[in-house]
Amino acid sequence: TFVYLPRLTEEEYDAMMEADLRDAIRDLPEVAEARGRMTKGAARMILLKYYMIKGYFDKAETLARELLEMEGRVYSLQPDYNYIFSKEGIGNNEVILQLACNNTASWYSNYMTAEVLPADYPWAEKATGWGGYVMPWDFYGTFEEGDLRLKNVVTAYTNKNGEKIDRSNSSQLAKGALPLKYGMDPDMKDGQSGIDVVIYRYADVLLTLAECINRNEGSPTTEAIGLVNRVRKRAGLSELDDAQTASGEAFNEAILLERGHEFYLEGLRRQDLIRFGKYVE
């Protein structure tokens, strides 16, 4: 006789998941033998994301500080933002967990560039552009002038026929800019890139810790402001102004905007908007 086990309660499931991740943090190595393998840092990031979803900001702050203690020894903030997502940057120590890719088999490849490119883009012979993702113009307009994170976001281009393409004559660009975050893999073929897909990285630790401090204290501290400014400095921007740090609410708004600019096309925006109560706006 086949017997169905009773469904766990949410509390039982959460407790089991948390215990499993705590065991993983204890037992896994700090540095993986190969890209994409689980480590202490990756397990901490998964648990950190769980705590943030559940609103356990005290626990999340403690865990984020454990990751902060790994800076220099295991992780660091790369000086060049765009290097993180380049062929040369594969295996860089800002990345905590990645989907290891190559361009020898379709099921191991990064298709992000192919999914963004229009069919007439100059790279399209290698990338077989599918004309998919865009960065909406409203969101593009929230970036500050000189933000280095926009370096690989294309607002206009000359196509394979030598024609100038912009938002006035392209149905794709009319919707938004082209977020070519992962750039071109020179060895790309048929849209298959060998640049790793980033899942978690150290900049997320800094901004998450800043958010936790603000939520737990009720207002931004010097430490929390400094964590955000580290990310902004790498992007070529000035420090947050007085209005952005005047209250806990204002600082939360600044963090949410910074997270959007820092992590575009990395799959984090939906959970961020839900956590900040903005998803249904």
Each model region followed by its residue ranges:
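N-terminal targeting leaders only when they are immediately followed by extended low-complexity/repeat-rich tracts
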Residues: 119-124, 131-132, 177-181
